[in-house]
Amino acid sequence: SAGASLVALIVVALFYVPDKDATTGKTDSVRETLRGMWLAMSNLRFLALILITAGFWAIQGQLYFAMPEYVLRMAGETYKPEWYANINPLVVVIFVVMITQMVRKWKPQNSILVAMCMIPLSAVAMAASAWFDGNVTILGLEIHPITFMMIIGISIQGLAECFLSPKWLEFASLQAPPGKEGTFLGFAHMNTFFAWIFGFIFSGFLLEKYCPEPGTLAPAVKAAHDAALLGQGPMPVEYSQA
């Protein structure tokens, strides 16, 4: 994707010719931008939508901030957390067209409700790896329980995203006064601002409390942790709620 973006940038730089007949659009001042933000954020229904969908993206953000360290600390370096990040876009690519067609005639709030009901199930699924005593065998293949439940949980997140994405901007535009739909659609993405701040801070807190860095533990506890990663014993009690 980075290579494709670079090629596109070069093509635009070399071949794009601006339309000389096009009129120059008026640029909003800072005051006008702030006035538009106040108009949007003072709408209680719109603000509620921002905060609700921020919770959705915060769960996903918290996962991606915490997942690499969580996998390495609980399963070991044999398991590559960077591969887990590909599951969500794969699920979205496979199912987004089908789900978008399915919810095409739904009310926006119904599609959003389905997504909001699914997203906590993804967190429960990923936490359920602690219920397994050993590796999971599927079609003769042994899979670490963290890997198995991560795949399930991230897949649920991808499906939830397919239900949310086609409709939440439509619902946001419905809250706007006539002629202000563009302003509301622009500020609808404020949800990611709140989501990433919360997800970033919360992921660090959860890791430190429930899945600490092995190097910060007592030598005996670190040795027990290293042995557990090699399958030579249980995880120390410091990781019992991870």
Predicted regions and their residues:
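Symmetry-related core transmembrane helices of the 12-TM Major Facilitator Superfamily/SLC fold
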Residues: 1-14, 241-242
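Juxtamembrane intracellular "pre-TM" segments in multi-pass secondary transporters
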Residues: 21-50
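Pair of pore-lining "gating" transmembrane helices in MFS-fold secondary transporters
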Residues: 39-66, 155-159
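Short amphipathic helix-loop junctions that connect adjacent transmembrane helices
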Residues: 65-84
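Intracellular juxtamembrane helix-capping segments at the cytosolic ends
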Residues: 71, 162-177
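Loop-to-transmembrane helix entry/capping segments in MFS-fold secondary transporters
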Residues: 78-79, 147, 176-191
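Helix-to-loop junctions at the C-terminal end of transmembrane segments
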Residues: 94-114
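C-terminal ends and interior cores of transmembrane alpha-helices
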Residues: 117-142
